Swiss-Prot record:
One of its GO terms (molecular function) is zinc ion binding. This is Presequence protease, mitochondrial. Its cofactor is Zn(2+). It is an enzyme of class 3 (hydrolase). It comes from Emericella nidulans (strain FGSC A4 / ATCC 38163 / CBS 112.46 / NRRL 194 / M139) (Aspergillus nidulans). One of its GO terms (cellular component) is mitochondrial matrix. The keyword Transit peptide applies. Keywords: Hydrolase, Metal-binding, Metalloprotease, Mitochondrion, Protease, Transit peptide, Zinc. Zn(2+) binds at residues 113, 117, 222. Its main location: mitochondrion. Degrades mitochondrial transit peptides after their cleavage in the intermembrane space or in the matrix, and presequence peptides; clearance of these peptides is required to keep the presequence processing machinery running. Preferentially cleaves the N-terminal side of paired basic amino acid residues. Also degrades other unstructured peptides. May function as an ATP-dependent peptidase as opposed to a metalloendopeptidase.
Amino acid sequence: MLRSYLHLGRHRTPAFRQPLGRLLRPTASILQYAQSRTLASVSSLESLPEVGDQLHGFTVQEKKQVPELHLTAIRLRHDKTHADYLHIAREDKNNVFGIGFKTNPPDATGVPHILEHTTLCGSEKYPIRDPFFKMLPRSLSNFMNAFTSSDHTMYPFATTNQQDFQNLLSVYLDATMHPLLKEEDFRQEGWRLGPEDPRAIQTQEGNLKPEDILFKGVVYNEMKGQMSDANYLYWIRFQESIFPAINNSGGDPQHITDLTHKQLVEFSKKNYNPSNAKIITYGDMPLADHLKQVGGVLNDFSKGAVDTTVKLPIELRGPINVTVPGPIDTFVSEDRQFKTSTSWYMGDITDTVETFSAGILSSLLLDGYGSPMYKALIESGLGSSFTPNTGLDTSGKIPIFSIGVTGVSEEQAPRVKEEIQRVLQETLQRGFNDEKVQGFLHQLELALRHKTANFGLGVIQKTFTSWFNGSDPMKELAWNEVINAFKSRYEKGGYLEALMQKYLINDNCLTFTMVGTPSFNKELDDKEMARKEKKFEQLTQQHGSVEKAVTELAKAELQLLEVQEKAQHADLSCLPSLRVEDISRQKEHKPVRESKVEGTDIVWREAPTNGLTYFQAVNAFADLPDDLRLLLPLFNDAIMRLGTPTRTMEQWEDLIKLKTGGVSTSNFHTTSPTEMGKYTEGLQFSGFALDKNVPDMLEILTALVTETDFTSPSAPAMIQELLRLTTNGALDAVAGTGHRYALNAAAAGLSRSFWAQEQTSGLAQLQATANLLRDAETSPERLAELIEKLRLIQSFAISKTSGLRVRLVCEPASSTQNESVLQRWVTGLPKVPSPTSQPQRFDLSTPSKKAFYDLPYKVYYSGLALPTVPFTHSSSATLSVLSQLLTHNYLHPEIREKGGAYGAGASNGPVKGLFAFTSYRDPNPANTLKVFKNSGVFARDRAWSDREINEAKLGIFQGLDAPVSVDEEGSRYFLNGITHEMDQRWREQVLDVTAKDVNEVAQTFLVDGTRRSVCLLGEKKDWAESEGWEVRKLSMNPNGSNIPSGDAA
């Protein structure tokens, strides 16, 4: 995969994302550039300045029109500071800004990462504490963030509102150019020593002991959590081995505690200046306005130091082997705890054509079940899944191509490199099938047509990555020039094979192996304790006694607490803000029409799609038996893996690439907008293609669903392979979105609807998959029973029953043709009803449920769920306002700023009827749960100001009015039955919410509500069992879990 770079940043409260995809690996990661409606005047050459023109202190250096992307790029330089500036003019209302700085990390203390956090904690023009988070509810931005990469840091935002753009631009520029970088912000965001709960200091009356002191800090805890992700750990240790010149920019907890505030300030002075910056703006807003505002800030600076150093990886002049220890994966057999990969260099990213070609080569070798590397390394059983570094990494100047697998035994580990080299040699001799190459080129054609809402953000991210490593951004944007150059070389014959010969057919490579070690986590704990004792010993010597050292730490903690509490009542009038009055009361209407084809309901959304048709079908199953529900995700995997009697999966993958932009199947679960507890579940099928290829797309989908051969001799082995793919790395998947898993597990205790969803997409599904794998590997009879159940699902998966519904998005001119195609498709479907079972009674007798998942993480993830009301209820909108108010005015300051968690927040799921509290990478879950518990009284008793109410409403409309990709239009009505009128009414209710309304719903649902369920994920401590938690485990061990997987009661 063309892996970008690792993003570590100040995110909003982590969003509740969809379950991690059960995909083999990302498909060819070629940046998906989308077309706009027409080549509008905003991106025409005539409306923009010419080379040599001077505007607001900038001089135009270069100008280029890119017709295939419907944009014009202008490169400028600031006359006084020589700051680089790139403007991308395009008819796109979602405008984007980004400023980046070269920040080569001098060590592994995480100074670029901690600087990224503290930079946004206050500036000269906006001297309040943390203007970044304070701006979140004062803006209609659909994206605000900051990212630390391996060698640069960037600060992007996106918004459709011009005043909002100017407001955010002012805040971002002042933050990056004039940061305050106060020591208390460094202590809060970076690291410090202090008592776990600062508020308990006063009550302990001098009884604070050295053992009560621990390392704290937002970034420190973030990186402890990051290091608990074995995939990240493998990737970063690999980077440290092949790229020692680039230190760990995120920070290693073992070294973060060596960083001082003085070093942070010096690093900022050295790197955060206009001469060392690169700036990008994108969209349809006037360039002159941007230059005037940006130039007004940059003109205060003189030309400064520029870090032009481009770090390079180690030289590979022969084989190098590196082996490091890592954590045990409890979802993998004890005798398969090795992860190993081999890496080569592939040229220079400044050669855009060769780098693009290397990406195609990587995809041909790795993408899909039919790829040669998948067959040799995973299908063979040698390993379970690809390593995190597998693919082409173009984040540095030298592209690095890696291939590796996890879940390998110690005896087989040396064979991995041998197999990789064997496959490379055989592929070189055999050459590449032209049909496969044409398939990838067809995918590029569709990517150019596909209209996405976040095109600008994608351009900025990719441009910064290569620009900071010496690539020409104008060449990067010239998409057709690159593709045409590739085609020209490819058509001469032997080009890709020559590329392989040049870079991969040699032994100039690094083999990196991580070995699962039982003592790994304990050794980390011991090292942290030793570091703490050393720091404490230094403090004791400094202050003369242990007691004085403890007293001084407590005093410093109370001082920080005082600063944090004062900030909660600070005057924010210096910050710019939009007004609620600026928001239209009318929701933009994107009408759909409905029809019936052969008795099947069809929802049509006719819109400009650049000649593409997007297809989505759902088949709903009523009262599906619990044992079959658990198998729906595996069924979806299987039909995209096993092949049919007429074609292997490799042949199907080639056809999919040649005829479509992709097809997929997945399980779906939606709740009623009008009735609590009512839900619909089943399977959904989707894909998109050129209008002329819609018949082929539907034929492919239908064949895969109905004809997949579960009886072939290879089917049992492939089923086990799929189970291993899912279980391998399951703990890392949970660590990445632990708050979401915790919330889903908590909600499962509230209703059968949430329980059913947990069975297919939560921790229960992960454990069920591990159980299936264990049974499949130990009992041929159990495996045969499993396959029979999958065949049963296949018989009714897609059928002409009352549960089948279809949505199409296409051009109006394509509707008639598509209707004829649909008619033929529906007519040819079988008519098989799904089996049913009597739903078990859901136990509502327990008002509060507590589940604790004992997992090997160094921080915690929590979720607390409360049932509320349907979407159409009058309290739904008020609950959403309440969630915003609690997040920004209570949970963020209490749990993140004071408690040190990376993220915390409240959310209202208006369609699900669920109010939720979550924390993410949290060192102090006991305190967090107390804060959750006190939230109701806090919200009920607070006299909410008009400003706070209005900011909460703005926060809701950030998501409500965010741009939507064309393929998503109409899906809300199609899946959930939410009409435009329902959305309009809910919108008006949000705008009309009062402070009194908020107080009342807080009383009703948070204070008086008796039904709630909570879940914690993390390392079990003694208090878990003493406080009434039901302790559970996730494991391959048959006795390692007591998760109820098939019992709704």
